[in-house]
Amino acid sequence: PEVYNTAEGFVISEVFFTQMLTTEGKPYLYGQYVIITNNTDNTLYADSLVFLQSANISSLKHDYTKDFRTNSMLAGSLFMIPGKGKDVPVAAGKSIVLALNGKDHSKFVPHGPDLSKANFEIYDISTNRVVDEDQPNVPNLDRWFAKSASITVLHSGGVETYALARIPVSKETYMKDYQYDATYLFKFNTTEKVMTTKGYLVPNSWIIDAVNL
């Protein structure tokens, strides 16, 4: 993986995206999580830190009509850690856990992680029949945007980019001014077609850590 980090001090120290199997051999993705670590000698505050998931997968090459990648990331999902400034302290060398679903997954899959004590969970309001679970004992992240129409999952093939950012404008301003339709030419054998990926641009100057898997 490729890693980018600034001097802010928060880093993505672990991304668990693996697809597990139930005892019946069925795929299980709900035990995914991300660990964010304070990589400094001082207490830092994770309030308003935004977790980003890339709009496109990194295993496919896209020839964009207008290439934004030299100065921005196109995010397909954005989830902010809630807080007013000093509500989420993270001591030096300590970590917080963002869970896809904040429950004990060892009850459902062998060796599944216990995420019932995660600091935050991703919760989506689905627009189709696949409905997310809201665990009452784990606070929800503030969902700004998610590319999935059902529930957010991390790609089990490990072909996405994940990042942490500080967004210096209000949610309303960001959602209005930074929405972006990225067009590219899709080619397969003799077929060519202009495709569009919808997302939100995040300037590189706002990103404090990123992992390109």
Name the predicted role of every residue range.
Residues 3-213:
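Activation on beta-sandwich/Ig-like modules and their edge loops
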